């Protein structure tokens, strides 16, 4: 029976991933800071699939807790076949008003939590020629203004994963990085921002997308098994188009991003006049989304 460790698996995408892998016959370690929910998830998976699933409290920013978890897994399972670094938080804010403490908090969880997990789990994955999956975001590829902390943490995850792809290839370890856009999740409940309405806006974006965490989990399961590195799970046609625009017409992409920033500025400063038709078109699109 294959063995997988998933961080942030008590809710959201992590929960969907835990259910998907358990349904495919994997033993799952549900690692999370949400003890009550995590215990319930493990009990449900064992009842539903009769696998060796268990919960372990894990603060992914703690080196000590990571080492203790790996020791527990080594004793219980005698190895590990896959690690999914899924746990994360949301963040938004302008660079001069978003606190340095919140910036550090975002990077510590979204990026350094995964780094610490890989540091202690990769030796087990080398032994099993296993699978490493890091959950980033479309924000790791497309960088909106007023989201510097989140962008940095997710772009760092993309770069980290790409480096590990070649580093771990000689050991037979497959590495994937997942870059979804908005999907139905509870990320908005775990975010910090300098805008009091940010959580409400984020929740509305996540809820209205029509893309479920379960559909993302299925894509991740299927694509990672065949060794796909960058998994654009759940991304809409518009997101893929913007990603292609950035890759092939970077100047046009940057002009579009600056126009979007001017719209955001106009929202905060009613006396500011938008410069042209491009801004008005973007505002119309944003109105339909928000």
Q: Could you say what each language-model-derived stretch is?
A:
Residues 94-95, 99-105:
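Substrate-binding pocket helix/loop in short-chain dehydrogenase/reductase
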Residues 10-11:
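Conserved glycine-rich cofactor-binding loop
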Residues 170-237:
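SDR active-site lid
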Residues 137:
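Residue(s) in the substrate-gating loop at a strand-loop-helix junction
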Residues 35-36, 57-68, 100:
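The beta1-alpha1 cofactor-binding region of Rossmann-like NAD(H)/NADP(H)-dependent oxidoreductases
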Residues 118, 153:
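Active-site helix of classical SDR
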Residues 96, 142-148, 152:
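Active-site loop immediately N-terminal to the catalytic Tyr-X3-Lys motif
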